[in-house]
Every structure is written in structure tokens, then in C-alpha cells.
Amino acid sequence: MNKTRIEILGPGCANCKTLYERAESAARDLGLDYDIEKIADMDVILGYRVMSTPALVVNGRVKVSGRVPSVAQLKEMLS
């Protein structure tokens, strides 16, 4: 099974931190082999065409931006 790459895009705001914590919790609950990284570089964020943060990127694909999903919703996005 391949390692899941999770990126949290955002400047480090409270919602960004919440999304990071929830995404990590969801990945752990699912038993995924994963790497998670916070990305604050605006050039990288804009490269994903994300205009509102926080955003969740899984294996290079933007799954959600501009809101913080629940852990249950994140589990669906990660599985």
C-alpha cells in the first residue's frame, strides 16, 4: 500500500491548525500509512489554485478549501 501524502495549505491560522489536527486524527483512525505537512508558502498554495484557506490536499489533489470538515468527513476524503 502506498503512503498517503496529506498537505494542509494555509498561513497557520486557527482553522489551519484545526484542519491539521482533524486530518491527522482521521488518517490515524483509518490506519493509513501517511505523511502530513503544513504548507504556508503562498506560491505553492496558489499553484494548487486555492483561493481560500485552509485547504486539504491528498496525494496532490485538492479535496476541500475554505472550511474545516469534521473528522468523519475527512475520513471519507482520505479513504
Report the location of each language-model feature.
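Short helix-loop-beta junction
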Residues: 25-33
